[in-house]
Structures are given as structure tokens and as C-alpha cells.
């Protein structure tokens, strides 16, 4: 009986060690950019300034915090999440970024509002430490 109990305990411990841990990954939200090319993939990992400049432009505004967020591609990369253009008010917000089983999992929230008189493209850009650059990015809507 003792051997069976020891065996079962060992199996449980071994199995629990193989379960992927979910580790939060720090990120910074990039502000004051606009989409240049609206025909982009819905999730985009960008690792260089030239690639970033191909998809996004600077949208500086006057006043406090009017400058675009600085991105240093020697130490960072970005993940952008875009939705199709819409004439509805749409809020797109990152919830968290986690590392799990060799992947980065980007969770986000979408809130759809009333119809507008204009068309806009909801998006956000997050800045992530370059040490996570090799990870594949998957997404999860909450």
C-alpha cells in the first residue's frame, strides 16, 4: 500500500511540474501614433524602426504628454493589435500580456459603442522588452 501511495504521489508531483506556468510580462502602452496602412494583420509584432515606420506615423499633439512615446528598438520591440475600420465607436484596450509555454499571450478587451459620423481604426501598441522577442504572440479577447 505504501508503494502505491508513493507512486501516486510521485506521479502527481511530476505532472504538476510539467504544467506551463503563466508569468506576467511588463509592457508600456505607446501613445500618439496613427495607422498609415489600414490593411494590416490584426496582430503585428514589429522588431525594427524601419518596419514600424512603414505601418505607423507620429501623431504629436500640443500640451502635456503630447509627444509620441519613445521606442528604442535596440532594447524593445512592439506588439500592435488592430481592428478593422469602423463607423462605430470602438474601445480597444490591452488587459495583460503573459508568457506561457513558450508563447506570449496578449489579452485585450473590445467595447463597441454608438455609430459615428466618421470612420476610425481602433488599435493599440504595446512596448515590450526585447528579451521576449523570440516568443510567438497569440491573442485572447476577454
Go through each PLM region and give its residues.
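Exposed, flexible binding/inhibitory loops of compact, secreted disulfide-stabilized domains
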Residues: 17-142
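Bacterial Sec-dependent N-terminal signal peptides
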Residues: 1-23
Amino acid at each position: 500500500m505504501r508503494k502505491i501511495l508513493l507512486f501516486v504521489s510521485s506521479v502527481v508531483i511530476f505532472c504538476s511540474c510539467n504544467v506551463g506556468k503563466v508569468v506576467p510580462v511588463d509592457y508600456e502602452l505607446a501613445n500618439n501614433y496613427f495607422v498609415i496602412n489600414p490593411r494590416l494583420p490584426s496582430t503585428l509584432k514589429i522588431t525594427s524602426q524601419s518596419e514600424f515606420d512603414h505601418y505607423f506615423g507620429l501623431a504629436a499633439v500640443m500640451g502635456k504628454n503630447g509627444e509620441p512615446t519613445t521606442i528604442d528598438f535596440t532594447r524593445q520591440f512592439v506588439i500592435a493589435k488592430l481592428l478593422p475600420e469602423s463607423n462605430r465607436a470602438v474601445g480597444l484596450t490591452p488587459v495583460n500580456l503573459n508568457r506561457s509555454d513558450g508563447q506570449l499571450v496578449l489579452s485585450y478587451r473590445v467595447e463597441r459603442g454608438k455609430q459615428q459620423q466618421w470612420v476610425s481604426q481602433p488599435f493599440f501598441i504595446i512596448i515590450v522588452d526585447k528579451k521576449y522577442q523570440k516568443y510567438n504572440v497569440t491573442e485572447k479577447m476577454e
